[in-house]
Structures are given as C-alpha cells and as structure tokens.
C-alpha cells in the first residue's frame, strides 16, 4: 500500500503547528488578567430569590474551581434571608444592593443572573459592558426589541 502522506501534507501540518501559538488568544493561557484553565474562577450572584436558593447550594457552590466573591439583590430582606438560610463562606460585607457596585468592587470573571424576567436584559447587558461573562436562564427578555 502506498504511503498517503505527501510533502504537501507534511508542510501544511508543520505550518499549522508553528502558527498555532501565534493565534491562540492570550486569555486561553491566563494572560491579560483573565484566569487560566487551572485557576479559580470568580463569580457573583445577582438576584437572591427562590431560584437562587434552589440552584446555589446544589449546582453552584459544589463546583470545584469556582469562588463566589459577592452577591447582590436590591431587596435587603432577601439578602438577609440568603445569609440565614444558605450555608456559605460569604460574609455580609460581600453583599451589595447595587450589582454595578459589586462588579466594580469584587471584579468577578462572570455572574449568575437569577433576576426576574423583566430585569434580565438590563442586568446582563450592563454586566457584559463591565467585562463579565454572564450565565442567564431563559427567557432572556420579554420582547425581541428588549433583546436587541
């Protein structure tokens, strides 16, 4: 059987291997202030209602390599309830009424937006403009216009 590996294929494969390090984004390697693949990812929770109380202890808190750096809810009664009911490592000084202040102070890599549907587009839009990755559940917004 004839060898199907030609000089052309060899040069193409070698060229790709040489060029790959030049085109891989620095963020993948953990440079420019973003976390690398093996570093802890800092996240924040926005909206501390029933959905958060359901998801946080089961799905978010147990994830290895994930650190909750702050929580935000404009309703202080809900924040108090979060700290009373949820076993967590957070301190009350990491709780913010204004999520923008929390993002500015704590500098999370991403947020979990568990707000009411009518608030999601606004909250996630601002968080993304501030440089955060966003986890959001459906529906993302109420109308097509709101999502644009």
Where on the chain are the PLM-derived regions?
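N-terminal glycine-/serine-/threonine-rich beta1-alpha1-beta2 phosphate-ribose binding loop
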Residues: 1-133, 145
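Active-site loop/turn elements of alpha/beta-hydrolase fold enzymes
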Residues: 48, 139-140
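Rossmann-fold NAD(P)-binding glycine/threonine-rich loop
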Residues: 140-148
């Amino acid at each position: 059987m004839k060898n199907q590996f030609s000089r052309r294929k060899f040069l193409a494969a070698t060229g790709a291997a040489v060029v790959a390090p030049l085109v891989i984004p620095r963020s993948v390697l953990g440079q420019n202030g973003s976390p690398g693949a093996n570093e802890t990812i800092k996240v924040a929770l926005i909206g501390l209602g029933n959905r958060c109380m359901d998801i946080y202890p089961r799905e978010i808190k147990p994830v290895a390599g994930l650190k909750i750096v702050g929580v935000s809810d404009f309703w202080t009664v809900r924040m108090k309830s979060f700290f009373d009911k949820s076993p967590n490592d957070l301190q009350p000084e990491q709780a913010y009424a204004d999520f923008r202040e929390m993002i500015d102070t704590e500098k999370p890599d991403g947020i979990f937006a568990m707000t009411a549907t009518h608030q999601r587009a606004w909250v996630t839009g601002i968080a993304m403009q501030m440089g955060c990755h966003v986890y959001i559940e459906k529906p993302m917004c109420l109308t097509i216009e709101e999502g644009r």
